Amino acid sequence: MSLRNKVTLIGRTGKEVEIVKFENGQIAKVSLATSDHYTNALGEKVEETQWHNLVANGKLAEIMEKYVEKGKEIAVEGKVIYRSYDDKEGVKRYITEIRVEEIVLLGGK
């Protein structure tokens, strides 16, 4: 059996795409909201929203910069990346990101 790190998400962006430029290229960062609906024990309908941090580089970063705006519905495929960094106070912080490998632009806002 082959082991994989693959995720597919369909949702709406929560903010404008942020572009971070480097000497050898750029990355695009944006948050994506996905929602699930269920009925709780009291018979009430509940909506639960999860926020995901998307990161793309190369041609995908260019596409996101040009075509993705706040509220845009998109579908992405990618992999889950866990990383850590030290903040300004020297405290180790952990972050989970989705490294985008494919993107499909869906309906408008």
What residues fall within each predicted segment?
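Single-stranded nucleic acid-binding surfaces, predominantly the OB-fold ssDNA-binding core
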Residues: 1-109
